């Protein structure tokens, strides 16, 4: 799959790459974060407790999905939203205390927001 994506990207223009890259990265990051919500499913707990915990653990994903939906059509607003979410993740999850935590949780959100803004300004310049 990765080889196909890399080969496909070789034939894309810079503008097309900047269009799809933040969207694909956002989807992959949302799926990555959703994996952490699966830790609530443990034997011996009630199903309602586990489902409630699962839905609460997915709150960051809900925010990212909302930002992605907005960014898909309104890149400037979406890019700013992603950067603000990155700042919120940094503060709320305290990723500023360890570089590895910052690089895993907050940096991808900042990067996605920056890529949305870069594409928007590249399109404006043309």
How does the language model describe each region?
Residues 41-51:
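Membrane-interface helix termini and inter-helical loops of multi-pass transporters
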């Amino acid at each position: 799959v990765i080889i196909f994506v890399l080969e496909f990207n070789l034939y894309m223009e810079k503008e097309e790459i900047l269009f799809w890259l933040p969207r694909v990265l956002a989807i992959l990051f949302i799926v990555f974060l959703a994996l952490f919500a699966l830790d609530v499913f443990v034997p011996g707990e009630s199903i309602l407790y586990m489902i409630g915990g699962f839905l609460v653990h997915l709150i960051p994903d809900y925010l990212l999905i909302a930002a992605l939906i907005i960014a898909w059509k309104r890149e400037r607003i979406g890019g700013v939203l992603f950067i603000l979410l990155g700042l919120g993740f940094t503060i709320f999850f305290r990723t500023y205390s360890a570089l590895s935590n910052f690089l895993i949780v907050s940096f991808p959100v900042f990067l996605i927001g920056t890529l949305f803004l870069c594409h928007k300004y590249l399109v404006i310049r043309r």
